[in-house]
């Protein structure tokens, strides 16, 4: 039943996209449909940004060390 509803929504959006000539939405729509059928959940945004914050902190520390070791001209 869930798959039938998703396919119906997919077909409606497909017709609307073709009518509006918004074909660039179709790859993301197909990917979302596949994810919904497989039952994957979206990742939390917080978990995506935490590693980047660590990288920024590491870079900042490296830059501070670099500037501390540079001679003054």
Curated annotation (Swiss-Prot):
Keyword Isomerase among record annotations: no
Signal peptide boundaries: 1-22
Location in or out of the cell: Secreted; Target cell membrane
Major location (coarse): secreted
Residues annotated with Lysine amide modification: 38
GO terms of biological process kind: defense response to bacterium
One GO cellular component term: membrane
Keyword vocabulary terms for this entry: Amidation, Antibiotic, Antimicrobial, Cleavage on pair of basic residues, Membrane, Secreted, Signal, Target cell membrane, Target membrane, Transmembrane
Tissues showing expression: Expressed by the venom gland.
Propeptide: 44-73
Keyword Ligase in annotation: no
Reported function: Cationic host defense peptide that have antibacterial activity by breaking membranes. Is more effective on Gram-positive than on Gram-negative bacteria.
Family label: Belongs to the non-disulfide-bridged peptide (NDBP) superfamily. Short antimicrobial peptide (group 4) family.
Name the record gives this protein: Antimicrobial peptide 143
């Amino acid at each position: 039943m869930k798959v039938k509803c998703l396919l119906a929504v997919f077909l409606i959006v497909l017709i609307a996209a073709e009518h509006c000539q918004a074909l660039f939405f179709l790859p993301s729509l197909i990917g979302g449909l596949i994810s919904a059928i497989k039952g994957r959940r979206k990742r939390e945004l917080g978990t995506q940004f935490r590693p980047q914050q660590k990288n920024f902190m590491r870079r900042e520390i490296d830059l501070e060390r670099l500037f501390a070791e540079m001679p003054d001209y």
